[in-house]
Amino acid sequence: MRENMIKVVDGEYVKTLYEGNLEEIINEIDTGYILILVKEGNKLHEGYIFVEDGKIVGCYYTDSESTEVFGNKEKVIELLNYENKVIDIYKYNKDKINLMKWLYPEIFACKDTNKVSEKNEDMSEKRDIVEKYLNIKLDIPLDNLIEANTKDFEKYLEDNKYIIINAYRKKDGKFENGYIIYKGQTPIAAAYECDLGVLLGKDAYEKLEEMLKDENTVIDVYEYNEKKTHVILELYPQMKILDENENKSSEKADSLESEGSITTAEEIEEESTVSREELLKKLGIKEPDENWIETILEDVFRPSDEELEELKEKIESEIVNKVKRMEGVSDVLVNLKIKWENGRYYIFGDVNVKRKRILGIIKKDIDPSIVKFEIDNTIKKYVSKYTSRININIE
């Protein structure tokens, strides 16, 4: 069993039920969350319904193994149909529900059924738009974070330097996410995803241009390089922001160079008219499978031992500085271990917080949840995908 990426902020426990009407439960807490637990064989299903001002605003489901679903209300509510279920109810204040929204905006991208029904009236008009979207899994590995939530990413666009920006926002109750790879001032690749699917290349870039003009869009900037860009474009060739003619000429040149005397210019020109599958078959190239993709990403993006040690020192130092500034704290000792596997950082260890004392009497209690908040914020500044298990000890 793996540890879930999502760490739900603790609420005030209200009670446990084994049956219940959802509307009545929501009215009882007004703001908070409902945890539904169902054990099926050896699998534990967990569903969270987040409520604000008597309305469902967010949903999260996990099977505690390999599946996480964000914003799908139906997926969570169907757990209420099971006989062997436990329903735990927790209250939140405004600060805690807002903290959850800030930490995990994808949870709060719930579909609004009323808006969906209104949009269905214009289905014929929007069919062409929907057909542009690809039903694929988008997985763009990110490198070292340069700046989070920046308002001026363009200051990092330097000649011949590669960067990638990750832009995301919640608009009209829906979550949008996208990536642009820059070489110098030039955007060379783009990908965009929303509830309709995935757009690549120019279509994605147009969507992201509009997002970048929105002051509510969060923009994170990451380091990149030529090698990593080439790997991404091998996995998602349609991400290239090129005119069709430029793209074709580039593909021809690459093919001529790699094939040498085996593939002639005439053959290349002839192959440009056939399908991608036929071309790959003719050249004896197999479509990459998931294992191949994972191997390539693992090889290219795996940080070295020196990089992991440097990352550990940065995170430890910043945690010490942040927690030490909290009222009532006299000292902070941090001991972390960081490893990297399958595109995710795993961070384990202890944070020991010593409280100030006057004549042996503790001056002020320290809230562990606030310490945890500072720790999570620090980690998110440096890595995007991680699992953490950090013990917080207040002395």
Swiss-Prot record:
Residues 246-273 are annotated as: Disordered. Residues 246-255 have a biased composition (Basic and acidic residues). This is Uncharacterized protein MJ0164. It comes from Methanocaldococcus jannaschii (strain ATCC 43067 / DSM 2661 / JAL-1 / JCM 10045 / NBRC 100440) (Methanococcus jannaschii).
